[in-house]
Amino acid sequence: MKNTIMRNWIVAIVVIAVVAALVVLSGLFRASSVAPQAQQTLSPERMQALIPRGRELALAGDCFGCHSMPQGPMGAGGLAIATPFGTLYSTNITPDKQYGIGNYTRADFHRVMRDGIAPGERNLYPAMPFVFSHITTPDDIDALYAYNMSIPAMPIANKSNTGVFVLPVRPFMDFWTLLNFPDRKVLRNDQRSAEWNRGAYLVEGLAHCGSCHSPRNFMMGVEFSRSLQGGEVDGVVVPDITAAALAKRGFDVPTLSTYLATGMAPQGTSFDSMYTVTHFSTSAMEPEDVKAVAIYLLTGKDGKLALPAASPVPLPQAAVPKNGTPMAAGRLAYMASCAGCHGMEGEGIPNVSPAMKGNAALAMDNPQTIINVVLNGTPTQVFKNGERMYAMPPFAHRLNAPEVADLVTWIRAEWGGQTVPVTVEQVSAQETAVK
């Protein structure tokens, strides 16, 4: 009798588990958040009127920074996005009917932006930041739709993904969304300024700052409980951009606005993936939107703007290093390999190389960013204010790991106020991570 009861319980549990799995895989639990009016077609006149607004929103969302190859046709896709599970390639989002989104209806586009589901019930991978665009208002999604449908159609085929993404894993994204796609709402605080609320809408939505600047879990889901506290992309650390962290690196609303609008500020210049953001997105945004983003990011939980910290004071052991110490070796390496461009006093050279003095990257607790720059260099960069920075050569084959560790330790102590020395193991790990 007991065995029969136990067997019945086991069968019941198995049946429930199978049914639950089928429900998840079929997406039955996922109620669409698309507004009912999206089922109606927009008139040609309305579409035309929405295009300018849509362009502004597309710039804020940096849509074409991901959906375009460098020097390639706008929106034609093909940009590689590395993940621990394989490489994804951004897709063609031009109105081409064969390879792009030319056959998307208004409702189709809304569902992509709000639910992360493409026509044919095709689950999108989270490289498409639908967990952020989910909060975008229906009117703004309409404007984006109108603009995307107005750009030149590019008959360019989409590239095939690699790794696990070649397998039929899209249905399993329903499991992913169950755990990693919270029903987020537009942040609205009537006790805060209109600028703060506008900045919150952009940062937490279309601009998807937290997509890179927040930690991710083992499933690559954004950890919203640690939003904007820093992340990692392609083995390179992405800095914490909470109010306290930005203020510690010397930013205030004017300097952060300048950085976003030009890619340059007293705290340094944008580079790597952030250069793409400032060059193609934030530098083209309306100035009032840029300021709103800066105000939101620099406002603490108490509702007050964080005050910028004073410039770091050089550590005594860096200013006057003792002979034979790693600090002395680091200073010597800087003078031999870096001072010619960055200056004996770290002052930099306008239109050639950024200053080390006051550089926010040196004030970061994690040295990965500077290690990566020393090892791999940076390309020539042209900024929207007309200035440029010339290419920095890689030093991976000129300096060994101990020399890089000493160099980075010294510049962080001299201009970043950092007391913790960089280890050979940290350099070696970064050499491996970026290969």
Label every PLM stretch briefly:
Residues 63-66, 209-212, 338-341:
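Short cysteine clusters
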Residues 99-117, 143, 249-253:
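Aromatic- and charge-enriched surface segment that lines or borders ligand/interaction sites
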Residues 329-372:
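C-terminal structural cap/anchor segments
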